[in-house]
């Protein structure tokens, strides 16, 4: 059983997946910072300083000064502002991943195009062709 596990874990797909998960976790931190530190202030500038993450509705009917106050009071809360921020985070992540994939595909296509261009160039005469030409030239002389 241990040998089977070693075989499974040493396969390329598992290692690629592990690297992807680690990079994804780091990427999530970067995107979260991008949204919190750059996008939210920009959105707040155009919305008059509104912070979406503070938008909520207390389901117990009471009025609370903030989302933190409502959750501290133990009130059931519909925190739709957090959902809005999660959607914004998702859209930014999806856009960045789209741009990365598009860039990688463009680079791959360019590399494949260069390979095809090299393959399409007419090849010079082969050794056999040269030997045939020499044979024919010698036959004409002698």
From Swiss-Prot:
One of its GO terms (molecular function) is mechanosensitive monoatomic ion channel activity. It is found in: Cell inner membrane. Coiled coil: none annotated. Keywords: Cell inner membrane, Cell membrane, Ion channel, Ion transport, Membrane, Transmembrane, Transmembrane helix, Transport. NCBIfam families: mscL (TIGR00220), PRK13952.1 (NF010557). Homopentamer. This is Large-conductance mechanosensitive channel. It comes from Roseobacter denitrificans (strain ATCC 33942 / OCh 114). The gene is mscL.
